[in-house]
Amino acid sequence: VNSNFSQTKLNLLDDRNQISSVITDLNPDVVINTVAYPNVDFCETHHNEANLLHVSITGDLVSVCSDISSPLVYFSTDAVFDGTKSIKYTEDDITSPLSYYGKTKRDAEKIILNINENIVLRTTVVYDWHIRSRFTNWVLKNLKQGSKITAFTDQSNTATIAGDISHSLFCLLDQHHSGLFHCAGKTCLSRYDFAIKLADYFGYDKKLIIPTISKNTQSASRPENGCLDSSKLEELINFQLCNIDQGITSMINSSKTIPDIFL
């Protein structure tokens, strides 16, 4: 966090009653809610926790932001879809989540979008030099060590370089747009294909990557097709999101060696 900004730390689950007063006192121009349980399998077996964080607390944020006339930004997911579509999903497609995680995110979207000034950004498989870029870090760490990994061939997403998300969001805010938008990379590919791309670009042995399928390996169902069409966003802000080659190249150019913290 930039040290030029003030910080107030809250445990949203334990300090829920303080959310309204803290935000009201700050009176921000915009509130960006990035809080979530990212572990889909955890949410499948912890309904109360997932519902509290994703839905109930989102409702609290919507209420206080409405009171102080500050737009609220919410990050959502491809998991709101069932994955049966043969092409990329658009914002107009009907949601039908397979997992409890997806259900809570869909329910949160509905609460957010009840207020016209708010923004929902759906994205998927975010990657970059960041400790939370779990798939990318896991692949690169193991391949660098010469360890074999398995990667699914039956689940596809439009992996998204983090910088594209931040740029797109600032464009939306600066231009005073609101509503529901998909913000994801252009290339629809499986986790296996993504891992192969990473091996190619970083010079690691692709033979270490073993293709597998997700059946019976995850407690929560995922959409087989989680690919998002971001044309609406791109046209609105006049910006083209990266395909997978452009995204990985951008990642490499921003740091010529892999930072130790990610390995």
Regions found by a protein language model. Name each.
Residues 2-16:
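Rossmann-fold cofactor-recognition segment
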Residues 13-53:
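NAD(P)H-binding glycine-rich loop region in Rossmannoid oxidoreductase-like domains
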Residues 31, 45-73:
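NAD(P)-cofactor binding segment of oxidoreductase domains
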Residues 52, 57, 80-121, 126-127, ...:
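Catalytic helix-loop patch of NAD(P)-dependent Rossmann-fold dehydrogenases
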Residues 110-157, 163-164, 171:
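NAD(P)-dependent short-chain dehydrogenase/reductase
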Residues 129-131, 155-164, 183-201, 250:
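Substrate-binding strand-loop-helix patch
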Residues 168, 175-218, 224, 259-263:
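Mid/C-terminal beta-alpha module of Rossmann-like enzyme folds, strongest
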Residues 244-263:
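Amphipathic terminal alpha-helices
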